Swiss-Prot record:
UniProt cross-references to Gene3D superfamilies, sorted A to Z: 3.40.190.80, Fructose-1,6-Bisphosphatase, subunit A, domain 1 (3.30.540.10)
Gene: fbp
Protein name: Fructose-1,6-bisphosphatase class 1
GO cellular component: cytosol
Taxonomic source organism: Sodalis glossinidius (strain morsitans)
EC number: 3.1.3.11
Pathway named in the protein's UniProt entry: Carbohydrate biosynthesis; gluconeogenesis
Pfam entry (one): FBPase
Amino acid sequence: MKTLGEFIVEKQHDFPHATGELTALLSAIKLGAKIIHRDINKAGLVDILGTSGAENVQGEVQMKLDLFANEKLKAALKARGQVAGIASEEEDEIVVFEGVENGKYVVLMDPLDGSSNIDVNVSVGTIFSIYRRITPLGTPVTKEDFLQPGNKQVAAGYVVYGSSTMLVYTTGCGVHAFTYDPSLGVFCLSHESVRFPATGQMYSINEGNYIKFPNGVKKYIKYCQEMDEATHRPYTSRYIGSLVSDFHRNLLKGGIYLYPSTATHPNGKLRLAYECNPIAFLAEQAGGKASDGKNRILDIQPHELHQRSAFFTGTESMVNDVERFIRDYPDNV
């Protein structure tokens, strides 16, 4: 049995940014995940369910657990001294850590993805993305450090809190997954070098918004539902409503996750920095693909901290198919 800590140290030499600082940073995320796991598991017994009464910068109502997870991760990252600042879906602006001006890294995160599912005991997750800072060491970080394209990520990953708690991460040398053993208090290697299956037969999208989708996406959904033995269609529709949970299933089983732009969200709804980039990094490292329907997600230059994007990710051939439908069936302008 190999623990997450042992595995990280063992693999340090495999990637160009191998430093003890990054190892300690990942350990801080591991600690935050353990704390969140503990409190999610007693969510129905203590007063952390429901809304907080506050809204985030996007005007969305914040759940109590959103704020709890944000504070716990922020504290864990600041305490280690490797992170000079963070950006979070739950924070209006970047958070600069005072006294850590020599920290080499910045972290962007969605502390609790799918938190509205907590009240009904459905899986949720944490998403994180790590970059080397651009500004000089010894100075406070600025927004410039956070507005880097996804192809500059040093590491990324997620934690899924479900029937078991699993941490999945990449440093650019494959995707590895660790399952939490609560009796020992450690994450143990359970899936090494995870790869998408060559073909997939699941699609994940909120079909309740069908009327708002672009023509190409509507055509693709119909394609998924058609009978064709040669391509093993119709595909199976599976949608949880938590990006982490839907992506995790499709990663292991083969499939595609779709969150297109809509009439009400013409730029898409998912956040490029906190959701799309880290998941895209994982997807590509697992042999999959991630796109906004036209462009590679990791090549998009962000201009705003909370910038949104359409998002299609999963088995490479399936993402290629949806891109083709979007290209062949444009909306009437």
